[in-house]
Amino acid sequence: GYIAHILQYARGGHLLPVTDLVKQHSWGQMGAWKYQGENWFYPYDYNLVTCYYRKDLYAEKGLKIPNTWAEYLENCRALTVSKDGNIERGGCVMPLASDSATNWASFGNLFAEAPQFYDDKWNVVLDAPENADRAGRFLDLYGELYKTMPPGLNTVGYAELMSLFVTGKVAHTLYSGRVVEALEARNPDLADKYGIFAAPDSTGKQKALPFAFDGFVAFKTKQSEETLKFLKWFIDEHYIDWLHSAWMNSQPVRLDIYEDPRWKKHP
């Protein structure tokens, strides 16, 4: 669930604080957050959204990794293959649904443009002229990118974002590291033909990686004490094994993991 779901449970008194476990380690940016002075969530990864692209197709067309919105759009257009007016290979695929895939993966180019959504008092300021202009131009970009997508896609969720790239139906997609696992398992011929890049802004000044956290919560039950004991045992003994179970998808948010020999020895 989202942070709002966790906060609802915390405010309702249904969660056990995990502050004593969280404070034992250093965390990446925005990794460990508190509500009412306590940690209610033990993170284990960033779900970073990167843009996957076909390196072999880039080489064929002499394309470079884009540094601006315009360059990204031109690359998508250049790699779109049409026959008799129909798109046979899309230049890209993007989320198109009122769901968590859209919330998670769509907005890298907008975040790179750095509009302000709220002021320091949580008032909505996205409609201020400068912010509205950035958001409007992003929507225009999205509309142009849509024209390079395979036809007939009225909704696009997690499944399509992965499957269309893995099967070679599109040249770009937005996803986390699970794409790599899917390529190696389902289409190994493409497993050495992909690359990744961060979402650029419109002027080439900066890039962004949208992300979402995964982690653990502990609910209050008749076995609350045992629940926390189990969580501590799991963190001490199997936390890294858990991360290795989806090694490309689970980018650790706990900073000490990157120096841990158990993490490094993964083949």
Region spans (language model):
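Paired acidic/hydrophobic, glycine-rich loop segments that form the ligand-binding mouth/hinge
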Residues: 1, 171-176
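Short, solvent-exposed loop/beta-turn-alpha elements that line the ligand-binding surface or hinge
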Residues: 16-28, 84, 96-99, 115-137, ...
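Extracytoplasmic/periplasmic solute-binding protein
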Residues: 35-44, 49, 73-125, 170
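A local structural motif
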Residues: 62-64, 143-157, 169, 187-193
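Short helix-initiation/N-cap motifs at beta->coil->alpha
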Residues: 69-74, 153-167
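C-terminal lobe and pocket-closing loops
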Residues: 178-190, 202-267
